[in-house]
């Protein structure tokens, strides 16, 4: 009952002027809650529905190909699973933002949601990195490192990725995740809650290096060399150049790289610059407030990646695109049939005949 009362009546707060209530506590960190409690839940609702539907569709298409699985499909399947698990952690975060950065569900549940959130975010980063290395080996070094593309070895690599991410994120369970603010709001998974942790600046700089620095360099290097190789192959083979296949592949590579950089760079650069400043001097309340607001924006941008991946699959994979269009055509056909059953008999027959004529004419064109 107490939890329900807290859900229904979150604490109210005024917006004080930028100041400190004592030498250590900044009271202006959440002054933006007035518009954040509207915009952030709206944004995350879109990410949740688009991400869940898109990735569920991707998993539905990948799953029947398990018998013909290869290294790329296996990495893609793990990436899809990480995106689905990530989106499933969003509803409680949506409630948290809708209540104006108030978490009434306790420390334990906050830690569980936080752990799921970070595990699947960085699992996704690592599987995108694996995909870039896999493509690099397939095109640039197909014979020398072919063993790394064997399905039996790739399975071990996937298990290793999950274990690595788990080891990187499990320390979160030993850190404080919630904090009661002076205005009565209880925050969850916010940066200021981690400030009391000893050497937090060094920990986060190391996390940025391992979780973002190594993957982004690997992805950009692999895809840059891959693009050069494809250009050279296109120049050497006039048929390939005329068909435009190389240009399409290069376009997809650039798109994947751009999405990764745009989604993940702002958050990690923002975190890195503040931690470096924190090592040099003690930022004041105004700087901490600006950093906190920027974190909320850059985290939104980072989380957008989970619902962009299915669109990349659509344009990058011919088989995926074909199957999606088949499913959509099937749904349209079912909708026509349902509509016809609800109409008078004569009109229903006219629609059915018209639909058959359309399908037959389409088949003749093909």
UniProtKB/Swiss-Prot annotation:
Membrane-topology descriptor: Multi-pass membrane protein
Superkingdom of the organism of origin: Eukaryota
Disulfide bonds: 110-188
Keyword Nucleotide-binding: no
InterPro entries hit by this protein: GP183-like, GPCR_Rhodpsn, GPCR_Rhodpsn_7TM
Topology, Cytoplasmic side: 64-83, 134-155, 223-248, 318-366
Subcellular location: Cell membrane
Family per similarity comment: Belongs to the G-protein coupled receptor 1 family.
Name under which the protein is recorded: G-protein coupled receptor 183
Source species: Salmo salar (Atlantic salmon)
Gene: gpr183
